[in-house]
């Protein structure tokens, strides 16, 4: 039943994103190292919500050479169907504060992160953010720059890159140096948080890679 309920209609819209870039500390606690890493935690926590709902078993977290971070899960994929607001539900999740499945009680009984709220905050505080949603046999794609959508919707829906048998969501983003004091993620803090998350969720596997050095560090929790 829950699988059918988690769709475009599960996204509830409350307000816009304007305040996030002006007062980021209200949403992520600050613009230092902890606030920077908090961007990753928000996306990971959304994937953990999928795990708690019974769908996601693996999360991959990569720190890329260009300073960006990639988070991928094998959950159901963010809803991409047409929302009553006239656009893809994914677009609402990433551009509207407080648009997320968490605010519709039918989709999740438990919720770890801001869920949806977190996605839009990460988007607003990133130089760019790229989304791929694997859902219903297709790879749906979207891209943003400082929170602004860069791709034109086709009849309100996302462009499709191709077909896939996988399900899940892949998000890659580059933190905005106009917002943060520094944009170099702390691998030590991140590894500690991922280890704790995996410990609290025994059936969840988390893969971590730090690709920024000469040799890639790989860990599985």
Spans of model-derived segments:
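Bergerat-fold GHKL ATPase/HATPase_c domain
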Residues: 1-44, 48, 92-94
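GHKL-type ATPase core
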Residues: 2-9, 67-89, 100-221
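A short, polar/charged loop/turn motif at coil->beta-strand junctions and beta-hairpin connectors
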Residues: 14, 22, 65, 165-167
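Conserved helix-loop functional segments at active or binding sites
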Residues: 19-22, 26, 49, 53, ...
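Short, surface-exposed helix-loop/turn micro-motifs enriched in polar/charged residues
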Residues: 28-31, 35-36, 51, 106-109, ...
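Conserved ATP-binding N-box helix of the HATPase_c
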Residues: 34-57, 118-125
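Long, structured ligand/cofactor-binding scaffold of large enzymes
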Residues: 47, 52, 64-66, 71-73
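A conserved short beta-strand within the histidine kinase catalytic ATPase domain
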Residues: 57-63
């Amino acid at each position: 039943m829950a699988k059918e309920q988690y769709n475009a209609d599960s996204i509830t819209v409350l307000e816009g994103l304007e305040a996030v870039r002006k007062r980021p500390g209200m949403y992520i606690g600050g613009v230092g190292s902890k606030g920077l890493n908090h961007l990753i935690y928000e996306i990971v926590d959304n994937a953990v919500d999928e795990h708690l709902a019974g769908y996601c078993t693996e999360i991959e977290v990569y720190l890329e050479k260009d300073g960006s971070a990639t988070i991928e899960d094998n959950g159901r994929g963010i809803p991409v169907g047409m929302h009553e607001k006239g656009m893809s539900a994914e677009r609402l999740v990433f551009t509207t504060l407080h648009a997320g499945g968490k605010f519709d009680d039918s989709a999740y009984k438990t919720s770890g992160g801001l869920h949806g709220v977190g996605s839009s905050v990460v988007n607003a505080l990133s130089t760019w953010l790229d989304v791929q949603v694997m859902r219903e046999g297709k790879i749906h794609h979207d891209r943003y720059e400082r929170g602004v959508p860069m791709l034109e919707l086709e009849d309100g829906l996302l462009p499709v890159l191709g077909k896939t048998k996988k399900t899940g969501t892949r998000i890659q983003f580059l933190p905005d140096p106009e917002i943060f004091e520094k944009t170099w993620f702390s691998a030590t803090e991140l590894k500690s948080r991922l280890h704790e998350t995996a410990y609290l969720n025994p059936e969840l596997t988390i893969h971590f890679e730090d690709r920024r050095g000469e040799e890639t560090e790989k860990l599985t929790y």
